[in-house]
Amino acid sequence: MSESEGLNMEQSRERFANEVDVALAQSARPFAIHNARKVDARGVAEHYWLVSDGSAIIATGNRDDDFAAACASVGLDADADSDSVSSVGSGDSMTGSAGFVTNAAGRMMTPGYVDIHAHGSWGSSFDDGVQGIRMARAGHMMHGTTRQVLSLITNPLDVMCANLQTVRGMMGARPDILGAHLEGPFLALSRKGAHDPECLKDPVPEYVDRLLHAANGCLRQITIAPELPHGIDAICRFAAAGVVPAVGHCDADYATAYRGFDAGAGIMTHMFNAMNGLHHREPGPIPAAVEDPRVTVELINDGFHVQDPMVRLGFGFAPHRIAFVTDAMAATDCPDGHYLLGALDVNVIDGHARLASNGAIAGSTLTLEKAVQRAVLELGFTPTDAVEAATLIPAKAFGFDRANPVTKQPLGLLAPGYAADVLLLNPATWAVEHVWCDAHFLR
Protein backbone atom coordinates (compact mmCIF):
# COMPACT_ATOMS: atom_id res chain seq x y z
CA MET A 1 0.00 0.00 0.00
CA SER A 2 1.39 3.42 -0.98
CA GLU A 3 1.69 6.28 1.49
CA SER A 4 -1.18 8.15 -0.18
CA GLU A 5 -3.39 5.06 -0.16
CA GLY A 6 -2.65 4.55 3.52
CA LEU A 7 -3.53 8.17 4.28
CA ASN A 8 -6.78 7.92 2.33
CA MET A 9 -7.73 4.75 4.20
CA GLU A 10 -6.95 6.37 7.54
CA GLN A 11 -9.05 9.43 6.68
CA SER A 12 -11.93 7.27 5.47
CA ARG A 13 -11.91 5.25 8.67
CA GLU A 14 -11.78 8.32 10.88
CA ARG A 15 -14.73 9.71 8.92
CA PHE A 16 -16.75 6.54 9.51
CA ALA A 17 -15.86 6.55 13.22
CA ASN A 18 -17.14 10.14 13.40
CA GLU A 19 -20.36 9.16 11.62
CA VAL A 20 -20.91 6.38 14.16
CA ASP A 21 -20.34 8.86 17.01
CA VAL A 22 -22.83 11.33 15.55
CA ALA A 23 -25.48 8.73 14.75
CA LEU A 24 -25.43 7.05 18.15
CA ALA A 25 -25.63 10.43 19.90
CA GLN A 26 -28.93 11.26 18.18
CA SER A 27 -32.43 10.00 18.78
CA ALA A 28 -33.24 7.19 16.37
CA ARG A 29 -36.23 7.42 14.04
CA PRO A 30 -38.66 4.75 12.85
CA PHE A 31 -37.56 2.64 9.91
CA ALA A 32 -38.81 -0.32 7.92
CA ILE A 33 -37.22 -2.96 5.69
CA HIS A 34 -39.09 -5.24 3.31
CA ASN A 35 -38.50 -7.74 0.51
CA ALA A 36 -35.72 -9.49 2.46
CA ARG A 37 -34.71 -13.08 3.14
CA LYS A 38 -34.71 -13.28 6.93
CA VAL A 39 -32.11 -15.51 8.62
CA ASP A 40 -31.91 -15.82 12.38
CA ALA A 41 -31.81 -18.54 15.03
CA ARG A 42 -35.50 -19.28 14.46
CA GLY A 43 -34.99 -20.09 10.80
CA VAL A 44 -35.19 -18.68 7.29
CA ALA A 45 -38.18 -16.79 5.87
CA GLU A 46 -38.65 -15.34 2.39
CA HIS A 47 -40.25 -12.00 1.47
CA TYR A 48 -39.79 -10.82 5.03
CA TRP A 49 -40.27 -7.38 6.49
CA LEU A 50 -39.77 -5.62 9.79
CA VAL A 51 -40.72 -2.27 11.26
CA SER A 52 -38.99 -0.41 14.09
CA ASP A 53 -40.41 2.49 16.05
CA GLY A 54 -36.92 3.92 16.55
CA SER A 55 -36.33 1.90 19.68
CA ALA A 56 -37.18 -1.74 19.09
CA ILE A 57 -38.58 -3.96 16.36
CA ILE A 58 -42.34 -3.68 16.73
CA ALA A 59 -43.61 -5.91 13.92
CA THR A 60 -42.39 -8.54 11.44
CA GLY A 61 -44.01 -10.74 8.83
CA ASN A 62 -44.42 -11.46 5.14
CA ARG A 63 -47.89 -10.11 4.28
CA ASP A 64 -47.99 -6.82 2.37
CA ASP A 65 -51.18 -5.62 4.05
CA ASP A 66 -49.69 -6.15 7.49
CA PHE A 67 -46.53 -4.32 6.43
CA ALA A 68 -48.51 -1.27 5.33
CA ALA A 69 -50.39 -1.19 8.61
CA ALA A 70 -47.23 -1.57 10.69
CA CYS A 71 -45.56 1.25 8.77
CA ALA A 72 -48.56 3.51 9.25
CA SER A 73 -48.50 2.88 13.00
CA VAL A 74 -45.11 4.64 13.24
CA GLY A 75 -45.80 7.33 10.64
CA LEU A 76 -44.09 5.68 7.67
CA ASP A 77 -45.50 5.30 4.16
CA ALA A 78 -44.97 1.71 3.01
CA ASP A 79 -45.12 2.81 -0.63
CA ALA A 80 -42.49 5.54 -0.28
CA ASP A 81 -39.50 3.23 -0.12
CA SER A 82 -36.12 3.79 -1.71
CA ASP A 83 -35.77 2.65 -5.31
CA SER A 84 -32.99 0.28 -4.33
CA VAL A 85 -31.10 -0.77 -1.26
CA SER A 86 -28.07 1.19 -2.47
CA SER A 87 -29.87 4.48 -1.85
CA VAL A 88 -30.30 3.78 1.85
CA GLY A 89 -28.32 6.38 3.77
CA SER A 90 -28.71 9.17 1.25
CA GLY A 91 -29.15 12.58 2.78
CA ASP A 92 -29.55 12.97 6.51
CA SER A 93 -30.39 9.29 7.08
CA MET A 94 -26.64 8.70 7.02
CA THR A 95 -26.48 10.22 10.50
CA GLY A 96 -29.43 8.20 11.72
CA SER A 97 -31.74 11.24 11.95
CA ALA A 98 -34.43 10.29 9.43
CA GLY A 99 -37.01 7.57 9.28
CA PHE A 100 -37.13 5.65 6.03
CA VAL A 101 -38.44 2.56 4.29
CA THR A 102 -35.94 0.28 2.56
CA ASN A 103 -36.52 -2.27 -0.17
CA ALA A 104 -33.92 -4.97 0.56
CA ALA A 105 -34.25 -6.27 -3.01
CA GLY A 106 -33.92 -9.90 -1.92
CA ARG A 107 -30.90 -9.41 0.31
CA MET A 108 -30.47 -11.47 3.43
CA MET A 109 -31.50 -9.81 6.66
CA THR A 110 -29.98 -10.96 9.95
CA PRO A 111 -29.71 -9.63 13.49
CA GLY A 112 -26.61 -7.57 14.20
CA TYR A 113 -23.60 -9.65 15.16
CA VAL A 114 -22.54 -9.81 18.83
CA ASP A 115 -18.86 -10.36 19.66
CA ILE A 116 -18.11 -11.15 23.30
CA HIS A 117 -14.32 -11.54 22.93
CA ALA A 118 -12.28 -9.10 20.84
CA HIS A 119 -9.38 -6.77 21.55
CA GLY A 120 -9.37 -4.28 18.68
CA SER A 121 -9.24 -3.49 14.96
CA TRP A 122 -8.30 -0.73 12.51
CA GLY A 123 -4.92 -0.28 14.18
CA SER A 124 -6.36 0.35 17.64
CA SER A 125 -6.96 -1.70 20.77
CA PHE A 126 -9.67 -1.46 23.39
CA ASP A 127 -6.85 -0.81 25.89
CA ASP A 128 -5.93 2.42 24.06
CA GLY A 129 -8.33 4.81 25.76
CA VAL A 130 -11.39 6.53 24.33
CA GLN A 131 -9.90 7.17 20.89
CA GLY A 132 -8.69 3.58 20.58
CA ILE A 133 -12.09 2.23 21.55
CA ARG A 134 -14.03 4.39 19.11
CA MET A 135 -11.73 3.47 16.21
CA ALA A 136 -11.65 -0.25 17.00
CA ARG A 137 -15.43 -0.31 17.45
CA ALA A 138 -15.89 1.46 14.12
CA GLY A 139 -13.83 -1.26 12.45
CA HIS A 140 -16.02 -4.02 13.81
CA MET A 141 -19.23 -2.03 13.20
CA MET A 142 -18.26 -1.70 9.54
CA HIS A 143 -18.32 -5.51 9.35
CA GLY A 144 -21.67 -5.94 11.10
CA THR A 145 -20.75 -6.33 14.77
CA THR A 146 -23.38 -4.06 16.26
CA ARG A 147 -22.68 -4.98 19.89
CA GLN A 148 -19.40 -5.90 21.50
CA VAL A 149 -17.90 -6.82 24.85
CA LEU A 150 -14.50 -5.12 24.89
CA SER A 151 -11.69 -7.51 25.83
CA LEU A 152 -8.80 -6.03 27.81
CA ILE A 153 -5.40 -7.70 27.74
CA THR A 154 -3.30 -8.59 30.79
CA ASN A 155 -1.48 -5.52 32.12
CA PRO A 156 -0.35 -4.29 35.54
CA LEU A 157 -3.39 -4.27 37.79
CA ASP A 158 -3.53 -0.47 38.02
CA VAL A 159 -3.61 -0.24 34.23
CA MET A 160 -6.37 -2.84 33.98
CA CYS A 161 -8.40 -0.92 36.56
CA ALA A 162 -7.96 2.32 34.62
CA ASN A 163 -8.99 0.59 31.38
CA LEU A 164 -12.13 -0.74 33.06
CA GLN A 165 -13.01 2.78 34.16
CA THR A 166 -12.59 4.03 30.59
CA VAL A 167 -14.99 1.40 29.28
CA ARG A 168 -17.46 2.22 32.05
CA GLY A 169 -17.30 5.90 31.18
CA MET A 170 -18.13 5.28 27.51
CA MET A 171 -21.08 2.97 27.98
CA GLY A 172 -23.67 5.65 28.68
CA ALA A 173 -23.29 7.22 25.24
CA ARG A 174 -22.49 4.04 23.33
CA PRO A 175 -25.22 1.38 23.30
CA ASP A 176 -22.97 -0.74 21.08
CA ILE A 177 -20.54 -1.25 23.99
CA LEU A 178 -21.87 -4.03 26.22
CA GLY A 179 -19.13 -3.83 28.83
CA ALA A 180 -15.69 -5.27 29.41
CA HIS A 181 -14.04 -8.69 29.37
CA LEU A 182 -10.82 -9.19 31.30
CA GLU A 183 -8.61 -11.77 29.65
CA GLY A 184 -6.20 -11.87 32.55
CA PRO A 185 -4.46 -11.45 34.87
CA PHE A 186 -5.59 -14.76 36.42
CA LEU A 187 -4.18 -17.10 33.75
CA ALA A 188 -1.94 -20.17 33.93
CA LEU A 189 1.68 -19.34 33.13
CA SER A 190 1.94 -22.54 31.08
CA ARG A 191 -1.03 -21.44 28.90
CA LYS A 192 -0.42 -17.70 28.86
CA GLY A 193 -0.46 -17.37 25.06
CA ALA A 194 0.20 -13.73 24.16
CA HIS A 195 -0.08 -12.39 27.72
CA ASP A 196 2.78 -10.75 29.61
CA PRO A 197 4.01 -13.32 32.15
CA GLU A 198 5.26 -10.54 34.43
CA CYS A 199 1.68 -9.36 34.94
CA LEU A 200 0.01 -12.70 35.69
CA LYS A 201 -1.33 -13.13 39.21
CA ASP A 202 -3.17 -15.57 41.44
CA PRO A 203 -6.79 -14.45 41.97
CA VAL A 204 -6.58 -13.60 45.65
CA PRO A 205 -9.60 -11.80 47.16
CA GLU A 206 -7.78 -8.43 47.27
CA TYR A 207 -7.25 -8.43 43.49
CA VAL A 208 -10.79 -9.61 42.82
CA ASP A 209 -12.19 -6.77 44.92
CA ARG A 210 -9.97 -4.16 43.23
CA LEU A 211 -11.15 -5.16 39.77
CA LEU A 212 -14.80 -5.26 40.77
CA HIS A 213 -14.54 -1.83 42.38
CA ALA A 214 -12.85 -0.32 39.31
CA ALA A 215 -15.40 -1.88 36.94
CA ASN A 216 -18.36 -0.46 38.86
CA GLY A 217 -20.77 -2.75 37.04
CA CYS A 218 -19.23 -2.75 33.55
CA LEU A 219 -17.38 -6.07 33.84
CA ARG A 220 -19.26 -8.76 31.90
CA GLN A 221 -16.78 -11.65 31.93
CA ILE A 222 -13.34 -12.55 33.20
CA THR A 223 -11.20 -15.48 32.09
CA ILE A 224 -9.75 -17.51 34.98
CA ALA A 225 -7.61 -20.63 35.15
CA PRO A 226 -9.54 -22.54 37.83
CA GLU A 227 -6.53 -24.59 38.96
CA LEU A 228 -4.73 -21.50 40.29
CA PRO A 229 -4.63 -20.95 44.05
CA HIS A 230 -7.94 -19.26 45.00
CA GLY A 231 -9.23 -19.97 41.47
CA ILE A 232 -12.53 -21.57 42.45
CA ASP A 233 -13.09 -18.99 45.18
CA ALA A 234 -12.51 -16.19 42.66
CA ILE A 235 -15.04 -17.73 40.29
CA CYS A 236 -17.58 -17.74 43.13
CA ARG A 237 -16.82 -14.12 44.02
CA PHE A 238 -17.11 -12.83 40.48
CA ALA A 239 -20.30 -14.81 39.83
CA ALA A 240 -21.84 -13.45 43.04
CA ALA A 241 -21.09 -9.93 41.77
CA GLY A 242 -22.97 -10.55 38.51
CA VAL A 243 -19.90 -11.19 36.35
CA VAL A 244 -19.76 -14.29 34.15
CA PRO A 245 -16.46 -16.07 34.84
CA ALA A 246 -14.92 -17.99 31.95
CA VAL A 247 -12.64 -21.01 32.14
CA GLY A 248 -9.64 -20.62 29.85
CA HIS A 249 -5.89 -20.10 29.48
CA CYS A 250 -5.67 -23.05 31.83
CA ASP A 251 -4.08 -26.43 32.46
CA ALA A 252 -7.00 -27.69 34.53
CA ASP A 253 -7.90 -31.34 34.76
CA TYR A 254 -11.48 -32.42 34.15
CA ALA A 255 -12.47 -32.41 37.83
CA THR A 256 -11.12 -28.91 38.47
CA ALA A 257 -12.73 -27.47 35.36
CA TYR A 258 -16.00 -29.15 36.34
CA ARG A 259 -15.76 -27.50 39.76
CA GLY A 260 -15.17 -24.16 38.06
CA PHE A 261 -18.29 -24.45 35.95
CA ASP A 262 -20.31 -25.69 38.90
CA ALA A 263 -19.09 -22.70 40.93
CA GLY A 264 -20.52 -20.27 38.38
CA ALA A 265 -18.27 -20.11 35.32
CA GLY A 266 -20.62 -19.80 32.36
CA ILE A 267 -18.22 -19.52 29.42
CA MET A 268 -15.30 -21.45 27.97
CA THR A 269 -12.75 -19.00 26.53
CA HIS A 270 -11.91 -19.85 22.89
CA MET A 271 -12.27 -23.64 23.05
CA PHE A 272 -9.21 -25.64 21.88
CA ASN A 273 -6.88 -22.63 22.23
CA ALA A 274 -4.65 -21.93 25.25
CA MET A 275 -5.74 -25.00 27.18
CA ASN A 276 -4.79 -28.64 27.56
CA GLY A 277 -6.42 -30.63 24.78
CA LEU A 278 -8.58 -33.70 24.61
CA HIS A 279 -7.05 -36.99 25.75
CA HIS A 280 -8.86 -40.23 26.42
CA ARG A 281 -7.17 -40.72 29.81
CA GLU A 282 -6.76 -37.03 30.71
CA PRO A 283 -9.95 -35.41 29.40
CA GLY A 284 -9.15 -31.90 30.63
CA PRO A 285 -11.47 -28.87 30.58
CA ILE A 286 -13.17 -29.31 27.19
CA PRO A 287 -15.44 -32.24 28.15
CA ALA A 288 -16.33 -30.43 31.38
CA ALA A 289 -17.56 -27.48 29.32
CA VAL A 290 -19.46 -29.37 26.65
CA GLU A 291 -21.18 -31.63 29.20
CA ASP A 292 -22.63 -28.66 31.09
CA PRO A 293 -25.66 -27.23 29.27
CA ARG A 294 -25.26 -23.93 31.15
CA VAL A 295 -21.92 -23.16 29.49
CA THR A 296 -21.48 -21.03 26.36
CA VAL A 297 -18.48 -22.21 24.35
CA GLU A 298 -16.43 -19.62 22.45
CA LEU A 299 -14.82 -20.64 19.17
CA ILE A 300 -12.53 -18.72 16.78
CA ASN A 301 -13.62 -19.75 13.28
CA ASP A 302 -10.74 -18.38 11.22
CA GLY A 303 -9.29 -21.68 9.98
CA PHE A 304 -6.03 -20.87 11.75
CA HIS A 305 -6.74 -20.93 15.46
CA VAL A 306 -9.02 -23.92 14.93
CA GLN A 307 -8.88 -26.16 11.86
CA ASP A 308 -12.16 -26.83 10.06
CA PRO A 309 -12.64 -30.45 11.25
CA MET A 310 -12.36 -29.25 14.85
CA VAL A 311 -14.88 -26.47 14.21
CA ARG A 312 -17.35 -29.09 13.01
CA LEU A 313 -16.50 -31.26 16.01
CA GLY A 314 -17.11 -28.33 18.34
CA PHE A 315 -20.58 -27.75 16.93
CA GLY A 316 -21.31 -31.44 17.37
CA PHE A 317 -20.07 -31.34 20.95
CA ALA A 318 -22.24 -28.41 22.02
CA PRO A 319 -25.11 -27.77 19.60
CA HIS A 320 -26.74 -24.36 20.00
CA ARG A 321 -24.09 -23.35 22.56
CA ILE A 322 -21.18 -22.34 20.29
CA ALA A 323 -20.54 -18.59 20.17
CA PHE A 324 -18.32 -17.36 17.38
CA VAL A 325 -15.76 -14.90 18.75
CA THR A 326 -12.99 -13.13 16.93
CA ASP A 327 -10.28 -12.56 19.58
CA ALA A 328 -9.42 -9.84 17.08
CA MET A 329 -6.44 -7.58 17.76
CA ALA A 330 -5.44 -4.17 16.42
CA ALA A 331 -4.30 -5.52 13.04
CA THR A 332 -7.81 -6.64 12.11
CA ASP A 333 -8.81 -5.24 8.70
CA CYS A 334 -5.30 -3.76 8.34
CA PRO A 335 -2.22 -4.56 6.25
CA ASP A 336 0.40 -6.99 7.50
CA GLY A 337 3.08 -5.41 9.66
CA HIS A 338 4.12 -4.67 13.23
CA TYR A 339 1.52 -4.06 15.95
CA LEU A 340 1.17 -4.06 19.73
CA LEU A 341 -0.95 -6.33 21.92
CA GLY A 342 -0.80 -4.61 25.27
CA ALA A 343 2.93 -3.99 25.70
CA LEU A 344 3.95 -6.97 23.55
CA ASP A 345 5.31 -6.69 20.00
CA VAL A 346 3.31 -8.60 17.39
CA ASN A 347 4.16 -9.38 13.77
CA VAL A 348 1.30 -9.99 11.34
CA ILE A 349 2.18 -12.02 8.25
CA ASP A 350 -0.49 -13.23 5.81
CA GLY A 351 -3.10 -12.05 8.30
CA HIS A 352 -1.75 -14.25 11.11
CA ALA A 353 -0.66 -12.49 14.30
CA ARG A 354 2.26 -13.88 16.31
CA LEU A 355 4.41 -12.53 19.13
CA ALA A 356 7.72 -11.22 17.83
CA SER A 357 9.50 -12.74 20.83
CA ASN A 358 8.52 -16.40 20.56
CA GLY A 359 6.07 -16.85 17.68
CA ALA A 360 3.07 -17.57 19.92
CA ILE A 361 -0.32 -16.84 18.34
CA ALA A 362 -1.31 -13.33 19.41
CA GLY A 363 -5.01 -13.02 18.73
CA SER A 364 -6.60 -12.98 15.30
CA THR A 365 -7.45 -10.61 12.47
CA LEU A 366 -10.93 -12.11 12.15
CA THR A 367 -14.28 -10.34 11.96
CA LEU A 368 -17.62 -11.96 12.73
CA GLU A 369 -18.59 -11.20 9.14
CA LYS A 370 -15.78 -13.50 8.00
CA ALA A 371 -16.57 -16.13 10.64
CA VAL A 372 -20.15 -16.41 9.39
CA GLN A 373 -19.04 -16.39 5.76
CA ARG A 374 -16.60 -19.25 6.44
CA ALA A 375 -19.21 -21.25 8.30
CA VAL A 376 -21.72 -21.13 5.44
CA LEU A 377 -19.58 -20.95 2.31
CA GLU A 378 -16.59 -23.09 3.33
CA LEU A 379 -17.75 -25.42 6.10
CA GLY A 380 -21.27 -26.01 4.81
CA PHE A 381 -23.14 -24.98 7.96
CA THR A 382 -26.79 -24.07 7.62
CA PRO A 383 -27.44 -20.32 7.51
CA THR A 384 -29.48 -20.63 10.69
CA ASP A 385 -26.67 -22.31 12.65
CA ALA A 386 -24.03 -19.89 11.40
CA VAL A 387 -26.06 -16.79 12.20
CA GLU A 388 -27.15 -18.16 15.57
CA ALA A 389 -23.49 -18.57 16.57
CA ALA A 390 -22.83 -14.89 15.88
CA THR A 391 -26.03 -13.46 17.35
CA LEU A 392 -28.31 -15.27 19.78
CA ILE A 393 -25.76 -17.57 21.44
CA PRO A 394 -23.28 -14.84 22.43
CA ALA A 395 -26.19 -12.69 23.61
CA LYS A 396 -27.44 -15.55 25.80
CA ALA A 397 -24.10 -15.80 27.59
CA PHE A 398 -24.98 -12.65 29.56
CA GLY A 399 -28.77 -12.82 29.54
CA PHE A 400 -28.94 -10.27 26.73
CA ASP A 401 -31.40 -12.53 24.88
CA ARG A 402 -34.12 -11.20 27.19
CA ALA A 403 -35.01 -7.82 28.64
CA ASN A 404 -32.13 -6.62 30.81
CA PRO A 405 -30.74 -3.43 32.39
CA VAL A 406 -27.85 -3.10 29.91
CA THR A 407 -29.45 -3.34 26.47
CA LYS A 408 -33.07 -2.86 27.60
CA GLN A 409 -34.48 -4.75 24.60
CA PRO A 410 -33.17 -8.29 24.04
CA LEU A 411 -30.61 -9.05 21.34
CA GLY A 412 -30.20 -11.86 18.84
CA LEU A 413 -33.45 -12.26 16.88
CA LEU A 414 -35.47 -10.38 14.28
CA ALA A 415 -38.73 -10.42 16.20
CA PRO A 416 -41.10 -7.95 17.87
CA GLY A 417 -39.70 -6.60 21.11
CA TYR A 418 -36.07 -7.21 20.15
CA ALA A 419 -33.48 -4.48 19.66
CA ALA A 420 -33.43 -2.93 16.20
CA ASP A 421 -29.97 -4.28 15.32
CA VAL A 422 -30.23 -5.34 11.68
CA LEU A 423 -27.84 -6.29 8.88
CA LEU A 424 -28.47 -6.60 5.16
CA LEU A 425 -26.08 -9.04 3.49
CA ASN A 426 -25.16 -9.86 -0.08
CA PRO A 427 -26.99 -13.16 -0.72
CA ALA A 428 -24.12 -14.66 -2.72
CA THR A 429 -21.09 -13.63 -0.67
CA TRP A 430 -22.61 -13.05 2.78
CA ALA A 431 -20.77 -9.72 2.86
CA VAL A 432 -22.30 -7.09 5.14
CA GLU A 433 -23.70 -4.22 3.07
CA HIS A 434 -25.88 -2.23 5.49
CA VAL A 435 -25.94 -1.90 9.27
CA TRP A 436 -28.49 -0.64 11.78
CA CYS A 437 -27.51 -0.52 15.47
CA ASP A 438 -30.07 0.33 18.13
CA ALA A 439 -32.32 1.61 15.30
CA HIS A 440 -29.59 3.96 13.98
CA PHE A 441 -28.56 3.52 10.36
CA LEU A 442 -24.74 3.40 10.22
CA ARG A 443 -23.84 2.23 6.72
Regions found by a protein language model. Name each.
Residues 287-297, 315-326, 332-425:
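His/Asp/Glu-enriched, well-ordered alpha-helical/loop segment
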Residues 138-149, 188-216, 258-271, 275, ...:
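Active-site gating loops and adjacent loop-to-helix segments of metal-dependent hydrolytic enzymes
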Residues 119, 134-163, 176-188, 215-227, ...:
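Divalent metal-dependent hydrolysis catalytic cores, especially in the metallo-beta-lactamase
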Residues 107-108, 116, 126-176, 199-214, ...:
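Alpha-helical scaffold segments that flank or form the walls of functional sites
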Residues 1-75, 82, 87, 429, ...:
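N-terminal metal-binding scaffold of metallo-dependent hydrolase/deaminase domains
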Residues 209, 213-335:
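Active-site core of metal-dependent hydrolases
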Residues 182, 238, 268, 375, ...:
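Conserved, mostly hydrophobic/aromatic
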